[in-house]
Amino acid sequence: MQISSAFGALIWVVTSYILYAIISNFIISRRHAAKARELKCEEPPFEKNRWPLGIDNLLRALAADKAQQFPVDIIKRFEDLGAHTYRYQILGARNIRTADPKNIQTILANKFNDFDVGPSRRGNFLPMLGNGIFTADGDHWKHSRAIIRPQFTRDQVSDLNLEETHVQNLMKLIGPMIGSNGWIEQIDLLPYFFRLTIDSATEFLFGEPVNSQLRFLPGYQSSKLGSKEERFATAFDSGQMALATRSRFMDSWWLYDSLAFRNSCKIVHDFVDHFVQLALSRGLREKVSDTNSGGKEQYIFLEAIAAETQNPTELRSELLHVLLAGRDTTASHLGWVFHNLARDPVRYKKLRDIIIDEFGTYENPSEITFAKLKACKYLRYVNDESLRLYPVVPINARYANKDTTLPRGGGKDGNSPIFIPKGSSTDFSVHVMHRRKDIWGPDADEFKPERWEGRKVGWEYLPFNGGPRICIGQQFALIEASYVTVRLLQRFDRMESLDKDAVVGHNLTLINCIANGVKTRSSIEFDGQTSQNDDQLRTIVEKPLVQKRSRCPLPAEAKLPKSRKPIGTAS
């Protein structure tokens, strides 16, 4: 009887809440409609729901996520409505979604002060990442950006010695895979990209890498931190997956939580806090000096920002935000670049021929510099086209901090302004915008780097956001990706995709990563011939870049001067 009464009470509470939400939503909608008429705004198309409060919208989003088709489903929603801006409802909240360049420019620039990142992202990220540059608003955001921006100058990106060290670790890993015919018959490049970028990112941030690549080599001996390095990398990945699922619930992100997620957060915090305490006690430089010698003094991001603030929680938060940007965006972008190139042997050869001409062969390379990488047009086109088709942040959102408007999307023709009430969310999808055929042509879904020849773009192309919160580290991300691409194409004369699935999966955590992996078959070239000697091939593939001028990486056994690092998400 008690169980029956309790169940009845629960049903009554749930039913009452749903009725309250429906009535409240109706009253608010009427109030917003009156305000919209006052501002001479018209309604955009509305995505109809089958269930109350748009519960079916949440279920559809979760199903698309599970099927690894979330960005594809967003495109279909726009196509079904035949609009570039529409209103939708999810768990009672009525939001706007747009893929209109003019609206996105308004949100990110023209009316920047009308929109915040908002409480949803901040509340979602807080348990793991804290409140840093990607979640803060107002004065807190200005403070974070002021601390971080000076750390990403051209001096930091132009020295590529650190990157060569981690590229050589990659080459040591793939060396044993080379067969007697000079081919690596099967390799998934994606996990190698993630290991490379987390190693280089953590070395830049903390002064030493987590050595996620080296731990796979025979005879590797870990540092005093031991398994904590590996546990950190695993926890950082699993924690991001939880954050991504929470984000599907939007304002109700708190509905998704677990002990496993909280445990991941603790592991991540404990690892970073170790380095923060070293920096605050002035012990970080001494620790790094014990493991690195020779050359100029190593730049350490944590040490630099610790000179600006001594708040340990703030330091940890900013480190984790930059790590998210510096590791995941670059690795994901590299995955999409090689996904595209491996499926297009003609363009792979075209890019490789240009790289050999401008940067030399793997055995006889010329100098690879920041300036030369930026000046390599076709390499830039390949990066731009991959970011157009597969932007690392395919959808983003802002919250209105006051009643405001967007210039387009309302009325029958979609050209009237629309009303954005205070507290509502406006999503903007660059993934959809980057594939609009009315902007990019009928071949918008095709990988075609040549389309960038002579093309000037504005707000229709936003791989790194725009306005005051534009990504301050986009050059770092592009230079690192370009450097790794050059070295791999110098090494592999051919690359064939082994993924025959026409459906491309999207593993959308906080970053859009290819779910299929980058499974390829690749051949190693040596002086234009394929060697038949395994040992010779493995020696060649592990050969470090020794450049001809003063700023050259030293052989692998030497200690390298270090400085610089990637990053990638908009702040």
UniProtKB/Swiss-Prot annotation:
Protein name (record): Cytochrome P450 monooxygenase g430
EC identifiers of the protein: 1.-.-.-
Cofactor(s) listed: heme
SUPFAM superfamilies associated with the record: Cytochrome P450
Known function: Cytochrome P450 monooxygenase; part of the gene cluster that mediates the biosynthesis of 1233A, a natural compound known as an inhibitor of HMG-CoA synthase in the mevalonate pathway and with antibacterial and antifungal activities. The highly reducing polyketide synthase g433 is responsible for the 1233A backbone biosynthesis and the cytochrome P450 monooxygenase g430 catalyzes oxidation of the backbone.
UniProt xrefs under InterPro entries: Cyt_P450, Cyt_P450_CS, Cyt_P450_E_CYP52_ascomycetes, Cyt_P450_E_CYP52_fungi, Cyt_P450_E_grp-II, Cyt_P450_sf
Transmembrane helix keyword on record: yes
Residues passing through the membrane, by range: 8-28
Class of the enzyme per the UniProt entry, highest EC level: oxidoreductase
Location within or outside the cell: Membrane
Phenotype on disruption: Impairs the ability to produce 1233A and its hydrolysis product 1233B.
UniProt region (Disordered), positions on chain: 552-571
UniProt record similarity statement: Belongs to the cytochrome P450 family.
A single cellular component GO annotation: membrane
Pathway terms, separated by semicolons: Mycotoxin biosynthesis
Keywords noted in UniProt: Heme, Iron, Membrane, Metal-binding, Monooxygenase, Oxidoreductase, Transmembrane, Transmembrane helix
Residues annotated as signal peptide: none
Membrane-topology annotation of the record: Single-pass membrane protein
UniProt-listed CDD domains: CYP52
Induction info: Expression is increased upon exposure to hygromycin B.
Positions bound to heme: C471
